[in-house]
């Protein structure tokens, strides 16, 4: 590099000062490199620009170790120069930063700001520095290129007043632009989210972490990884914080948090508000931890009746980690349930309809991310606006401003995946770069041209095409994007709009194809990778359009807004109450927020300077004359105009998308930068390499950036024209103190001055009215003294002089700024020396500092509400008194029983341990517990009766008869028992222990099963004390076994082994106690029982001269004693002593057994005159010598009773089943019913079923073989909800199936619903038409419950019972002629005037579920049953499973469904009292056939079934668990003379639950509702039958069987045990009976040839424990599992209860009602008025009160109207081929006509759907016999029209002429007259 003189070339800091041959990209790069390598990483573009290279080390040290030559030094120098211009010229100063991410923009910006603030060392300057730090903390992040990447556009404004040369800082303003919100939920790999989140996690104390839930005690598993984290926070993976390694990237987060809190405190944020900010930040982190899974909504909601076709509950998304959810809810001041609801649902606007989408787990995760993103965006906006409110000065006091503009760097790809963020930031960079080019090239050129000064032109890259293409209002790319968003267009439509606008019109924008052709295919498909390309100044970028339109909408769902309305946190309410949140209200109800949008532009605008220079203003006005018309001014935020603009309605409800808002904010910046009194400086930040290596210069990398920013062209331009100041001649001459003595014009004088100054021509030129100067030249004449010294302390680059260090005159007064050296707040730029950060002087705010220190040293949440208190507060509902209800006496009695049973459970324990805060919930739990106690007591009683009671009556005896003993002979698998002296022992167990061991066991086993007493002779004297206490040892007593069976195997006294056990006195080995000892041992170890003798057999033995009798249930035998068994024997060698008394037993005892042989001698024994000693001695002798067994009472009467009681129970159960079997044997052919003419309604309630299920149900109902014109298909859609797996809301699916066009949009009408408080007011839409399927043309009506405008989540949804009540209440009011709601009047109008049937004609209603398929002959068979039996009020058919083989769960249910219908319902049908008519397939009689009295829709049924106050456990089980069964109960209760029956010939197929959870929930509903409904039925007196044959007895048995179902399993298990252990015939008989049960069932399905049921029966039997044990126990304990809603009861005065609700109080008057006659009169009047003006028959709708042409019922006639419509199911040509009208009955009409006139079917009603061709008028009026026939009227109308003036004739005039001719009132023929007139005039007749 060349040198100039002795000064090295690299010392030249100003690039324009380089020679011309060095003004290229390559040479400039080389020059920057030479400076970089000598630690001079900066350069200048004269006075207008600064170039800084990031050294990745310190930005505060230059080549000499001080700041001179560093980025910090250059920033300070630039600030001094701008400060001088601000003070001396009163110009606004603006600094625009350019640079890619990682170029160090944020650091240089902080140095620049610190320099300006140091000029005004006041507390305000400190606050403004802290404000910038807070902004960076909230909006910067660490990326792969830098640790301080800015992710929001910044416009920082310093405000000054007007004061001579030293402006006073009076305020500041932070304007944030488009925060990169997507980073919150999608942290790129290797990057971080916003710093403040890491600060919070690292900087909080242990107590604060505990409060915020950030400690390790919350067990959280990272979604998708399955890795559970340990208790340490540092090892827990936070989803919103990226990879855990990002928490250790060299940033001191803990210190950053302390700085952040200090900054907020010094900015005057209250302590409580800082705590609230931290709680919201913690809530955001916890939202990221929420894990979602798929579950079942098994708890019935408070306003729902549950089931629909989903009998056990619908599939919903649930939060798995509810502890984390509770933390989020607590910090947001919300209820846990409310928060979960809002996360699982999302409401959208589709075709102007609000629709709630039931989200899957992915959708719920995205919804949670949206909540987190919205929270963070609003929090940032709130903090910034709060700062602005504290530091911003009043607009009218601001004289000048210094603005710093810093937007995120240009990006060629989106790291977070947000294309919109990338597009908007790049557009901002494009606009700011264009402003730079315009300022340097165009603005100067315009000024010079206006002064007729010519300079050489400089070529440069002009990005105007890109700027116009992107930013032009009206038809720029961003404007088009916003327009397409507001119109609700798709991405493809947006792309096509871009094509039309830019193709071949703007070379900067290229639009890709919206379609693509796959290889091997000739058909174009949608291009999923469709994109457009923008040629930016920094290069071409492709922008995919996928989801771009939706992302631009930036919509916050109405569910979230509706949820936040209920927050108990004032801070959160303030967040969502900001002006930054643009809300969209429902057009019909302004208080209902449909959706919202977080603003992408700041809440404030740049200040408008009040001080202008006249010359500049003049020049600006000249330029304006040549410029296009200005764009419309954006209204100031917060003004009324802005509010009005925000509320303009659009297709999507949005007024502006993110693009339009950003574009508006960008316009404000551009206007601010290009204002006449603004001097701009441009700072270009470059990164020396892409790898963030310190002190390494990559020439290629830098050259690309130099080329990108056009630095060479800018430098060349400044070499020819470096003019930034224009001075009029007078001002210029005044500054230069030109000699007044010089004669000449001012121009000449100025020229002389210029000549004398020797300024180069590129820095000083003279114009027509003034002088153009560079900033350096101006400073040399304008600044004096210290100002000049300060300014020239750093030279700006004279061509002849290199930079020299200068003195800083502000160093004495400037406050040194403190920072940190570790890359944390204060300075984010390598290891900064203390001095260049955000934080101002410690001395300036010592008081605030001390307060902050005290604040962050402890627990910021001390003395604030705890997390638990916040949770309780959030769950508490705001309630108001809505009703006072009395407490019934029965309820009081029941509660008394409940508290008697649960008194030992204190209320506080239930409250705190059970978590039940509400009194009514605790009461319900007590009721549940009491009911369970009663159930368990009942089960215990049954167990006692079955098992314990028989044992009490007949205690178990361990006795063995001879036969039983013989069976234990040890052969085969039999055990080996042996009897010795009446005792039975286990020989098998004894044999291994026999002594001596040498005796083989085979020798011992021969004694098995026999009485071996003979083997064991006894020593009498050892076992008996005799009469006087001693028996001579020589006395012997032989033992002769009692023949107890006649064939007993008895061991004789001659047995060979006897001698081995003979140890009597006379033997050689006398052991008198041996036998006694052996017996003690045997009894202790081997005894099994005793030999048993029945009393009858004892008597038999006595008859055989046996001296045997019973004493105390023990049998003693004196036969041997009496018959010579006594003897006297002495040992060998000894003489037998004489006089030995062998009568050792008392004679009284002997006589007693001899004389009373065969009897029980107990009472005689007790009467013997024996002294106690003798009696005791005799008893001892009896037991040891004469005992042979015990009394066997097993066949006694009481034991037989105990035994057969089990059999009796089995017989009783089997008898009931037997009756059911005979009831099921309904043989006979399927009688084909006669042609029926009754009108039938088929109602299908729809909720979230899929299209296939709905189509099957609707098609099956339409295809039923029943007269189509007498069927009416009514589908009631419960809410605007998109079910999981569906792509459209359920009503739209139904309407698409029925062929209704999307253009048909009736007005929603009010009606009453079942709900809490204001939810009783609902709104619905009515559609009607004809549905054609497989040759059937069926009229239909669809009622869609859409909800009031104020309903955001699940609008209109009220549950299945409410869907039933819509039709039932309507028919009730029709039959009772009661005033109707608008919706009901519209339904009446549709059915009567459009479909053509009087609603009173419908006699029967068939209710099916939306997933039920009915057999074609179902309706005919049910109607036939009604006609055969006029006392029948309801019938059900057999329902089978259509998904029988889906899973084992469904397989278990197949057989159960079958027997529940063919046994239970068939049996109940015998009594005419089927206790449960299933809602999935039942037909009801609407009115009595003879009298027309309403039955199904009677007053009592409607009143009880529409009960809204469902606040007790009993009522909830009735109405929320089993509404179908309760409806049947009401029918039996109020219409006891009518019957309910089961018809097995009518078939339907439904879907059963296929998962355990849904199945258990379904059965919980069924079991509990069964119990509560049977309790309702038992007290009824009207149930038929008498005694045990009454239905009440059967109901009681059903209730008992339901309650004690678990015992049945125990009973069967008990029988199995009995059968296994006893060979008795009784349990075997019981099993035979139980087998007969299934045998009878088998007979049923065999006779009906249901062979497959054999297999299903086996599956059912295997599942018996589940059905009879598991499910009942689960159901009983979960009897109180409900979503209790927000209505509750509290105890009031005088025994009354007050009903409280947070849904508001419903006023019935809010829904207008009107009788049909009044409404019909209005129709006629309106029609007559229009008839006078128009010759056209009209239809008139309550919903619109508008004139609508009536269409044909054949279809197509209503497709173009707003309200009335028919499905265009068939074409006209198809219809005209029918020889007779479809609904015609032939009565009086010309049958030769091919088709009817358009209104003939609707207007006359003369033959539409009437029995036997009769008209509505024929059926209703009795005075029409004198009216002329239709043919007579037709002939007269033709005659009148033949002579009438067709220009003046009206239908009213024709009617009046006909009345004159026939002399009769023809009001009832008005419609026919009109339709006939129309037909004649149109040529159809």
Swiss-Prot record:
Binding positions for ATP per the UniProt entry: 99-106
Region annotated Actin-binding, chain positions: 666-690
One Pfam family this sequence matches: Cyt-b5
Domain DEK-C, first and last residues per copy: 1827-1882
One BP annotation, GO: fungal-type cell wall organization
Induction: The expression level increases quickly and almost doubles when cells were shifted to 37 degrees Celsius, compared to cells maintained at 25 degrees Celsius. Expression is also increased under additional stress conditions that are known to initiate development of the sclerotic morphology (acidic conditions or Ca(2+) limitation induced by EGTA) or of hyphae (induced by nitrogen limitation). At least one negative regulator binding sequence exists in the promoter between -880 and -680 bp and another regulatory binding site is localized between bp -680 and -450 bp.
Top-level EC class: transferase
Protein name from the UniProt record: Chitin synthase 5
Residues with glycosylation annotation: 219, 429, 668, 1043, 1068, 1462, 1568, 1759, 1790
Disruption phenotype: Leads to hyperpigmentation and loss of viability in stationary phase at 37 degrees Celsius. Reduces the virulence in a mouse model of acute infection. Causes cell wall integrity defects and subsequent abnormal yeast morphology at 37 degrees Celsius. Does dot lead to compensation by increased expression of another chitin synthase genes.
Membrane-related topology note: Multi-pass membrane protein
CDD domains: MYSc_Myo17
Family, similarity comment: In the N-terminal section; belongs to the TRAFAC class myosin-kinesin ATPase superfamily. Myosin family. In the C-terminal section; belongs to the chitin synthase family. Class V subfamily.
Keyword ATP-binding carried by entry: yes
Maturation and modification: Maximal activity requires trypsin activation, suggesting a zymogenic nature.
Domain Cytochrome b5 heme-binding residue range list: 957-1016
The protein's Enzyme Commission number: 2.4.1.16
GO cellular component annotations of the record: cell septum; myosin complex; plasma membrane
Catalytic reaction(s) noted: [(1->4)-N-acetyl-beta-D-glucosaminyl](n) + UDP-N-acetyl-alpha-D-glucosamine = [(1->4)-N-acetyl-beta-D-glucosaminyl](n+1) + UDP + H(+)
Localization (cell): Cell membrane; Membrane
